[in-house]
Amino acid sequence: MKVGLFIPCYINAVYPEVGIASYKLLKHVGVDVDYPMDQTCCGQPMANAGFEDEAARLALRMEEQFKNYDYVVGPSASCVAFVKENHPHILGKRDHVCMNSKKIYDICEFLHDVVRPESLPAVFPHKVSIHNSCHGVRELHLSSPSERNIPYYSKLRDLLSLVKGIEVFEPKRVDECCGFGGMFAIEEPEVSTCMGQDKVCLLYTSDAADDR
């Protein structure tokens, strides 16, 4: 299988080490991965702000960039969820069929559901606390949402359990929003900041904080 690595614009600009680590990780587990150099934003900021025509142009560009790959994999649940859930609507109104939505995965989802490694040659003898993102939980189903009465599961915890020496914890309110929410953080910065501070406090008071 041939995988195209989708790196969202905020990761490219602010956290490039995440993109590099994603590429190395996929290579390490035996994936034939490529990084299309001309890729750009998926269009989520424009769509969230109401500029659907601009978002559609970027969606079409992304379709062209990734059309020859079996899978599209990205290290961002939010951007992956936008492509999966919103690109078909945006492009469908313009008589274009969205192919990326059928083959795009968050990197954790891809490792868990497609690659399915039975072990990882990794050692991390520390306590860690999981951040369950809103889009990851409720749109990509990376873990069970707390508001639904269904059995607990966590694809993130499953993957981390393959790392030797690690102890995994979750905060008391496991999937509370961090306050980012894309445009919400820009339009409501004060509320967003307070929500982020609450989230940090939850993580700091989890059992993983004892390892500091």
Where are these regions (language model features)?
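Conserved small/polar residues in nucleotide/adenosyl-binding loops
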Residues: 204-212
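Short, structured active-site "lid" loops
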Residues: 50-71
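Local cysteine-cluster metal-coordination motifs and their immediate loop/turn environment
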Residues: 8-12, 38-48, 75-81, 131-139, ...
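Glycine/small-residue-rich loop that forms an oxyanion/phosphate-binding "nest" at active or ligand-binding sites
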Residues: 89-96
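Anionic-ligand binding region
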Residues: 146-163
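A short, acidic, amphipathic alpha-helical segment used as a generic capping/interface helix at domain edges
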Residues: 191-203
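Immediate flanking context of iron-sulfur cluster ligation sites
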Residues: 29-38, 62-63, 68, 165-175, ...
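Extreme N-terminal starter segment of soluble prokaryotic enzymes
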Residues: 1-3
